[in-house]
UniProtKB/Swiss-Prot annotation:
Belongs to the eukaryotic ribosomal protein eS28 family. The keyword Ribosomal protein applies. It comes from Arabidopsis thaliana. HAMAP family: Ribosomal_eS28 (MF_00292). It holds the Pfam family Ribosomal_S28e. InterPro entries: NA-bd_OB-fold, Ribosomal_eS28, Ribosomal_eS28_CS. One of its GO terms (cellular component) is cytosol. Coiled coil: none annotated. This is Small ribosomal subunit protein eS28z/eS28y. The keyword Cell inner membrane does not apply. The lineage of its organism: Eukaryota, Viridiplantae, Streptophyta, Embryophyta, Tracheophyta. GO terms for molecular function: mRNA binding; structural constituent of ribosome.
Length: 64
């Protein structure tokens, strides 16, 4: 299971989403590759934070 854990750096905070705005949509860059994806993050987050992603293939849908 440890091989699936990936670290990613928050590059840009895109905006708030969710029914009450409790989720933040962010663009992250993986530390071990040059790949960028969008993720939804619950809780406080800002640019430069390092996230530990247990599942790295799932990408969030864009905000409307």
């Amino acid at each position: 299971m440890d091989s699936q854990i990936k670290h990613a750096v928050v590059v840009k905070v895109m905006g708030r989403t969710g029914s009450r705005g409790q989720v933040t949509q962010v663009r992250v860059k993986f530390t071990d590759s040059d790949r960028y994806i969008m993720r939804n993050v619950k809780g406080p987050v800002r640019e430069g934070d390092i996230l530990t992603l247990l599942e790295s293939e799932r990408e969030a849908r864009r905000l409307r």
